[in-house]
Amino acid sequence: MSLAPPKVDLDGQPLRADDSVQFAHDLLRDDILTGTIAPGAVLSQVHLAARLGISRTPLREALRRLIAEGLVTGDFNRRMRVSELDLEDFDQIYAMRFALEPVGIQATIPMLTEQERSELTREVERMEAAAEAADREAFRSAHRAFHLGLTCRAGERIQGTLAELWDHSERYRLRYLHQNGPDGDGTTVELLRRPQVEHRAILDAALAGDAANCTAHQLAHMQHTLAAVFQEAAPPPVPRMSRIAIAESARG
């Protein structure tokens, strides 16, 4: 478990309680989403508090937030665990993305500024460089920034929902596609290169101000990821909710 030493501010003073909550939440959330803390892992409050260098009061608040986000299960009177991965859950996450991302893209693409266009281009270039360097963490950062940049004008509530759905879906993508990849560590150049043609097509449509084409490329990109994740299961289940959402998007 990659937990940091006790956290202090710039003056070397211990963090305030509210800062400690945010610190613990952000670190644990990132470790859960990236699989550093594995699905089903038991979370010992005593151990976590000691490793994080904080008291159990802010830790419990951080864990409450993670429970509310669906990343941790259990309660404070019994054993707490990292939520297991469940392809039915992944199906629902993607169904929601299929429904919301076209709205976000349609709201954003016609409104993009030159700076925002440059930022989208830069994130694709960062992904391409990270793929060649087999740098999974750099790729993950650029990948997230690119896709959320496509919906940045959707409004705070929609964008916040899309960001949360993205983070939850990334947990599955990393687990099923990268950790189960040919080298088992998710850092092969091929795995990171694979989606780059699709990202370039999405980017080209965005830069051209073509929201309809950008949406079509993005939905196709998502369908490929959905299918790849489900194919890792034996036998592959049917992504029922996603299929309904895809059909509705096509009719719209």
Label each region the model flagged:
Residues 73-74, 93-94, 99-102, 106, ...:
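Catalytic cores of transferase enzymes with a strong primary signal for eukaryotic protein kinases
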Residues 1-110, 115, 226, 230-252:
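Short linear motifs at protein or domain termini
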Residues 114-178, 198-201, 213-224:
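Conserved amphipathic alpha-helical segments that form helical-bundle/coiled-coil interaction surfaces
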Residues 2-5, 133, 175-252:
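C-terminal all-alpha effector/ligand-binding and dimerization domain
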Residues 11, 34, 106, 110, ...:
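General structural signal for alpha-helix termini and helix-helix connectors
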Residues 28, 58, 89, 146, ...:
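Hydrophobic alpha-helical segments typical of transmembrane helices
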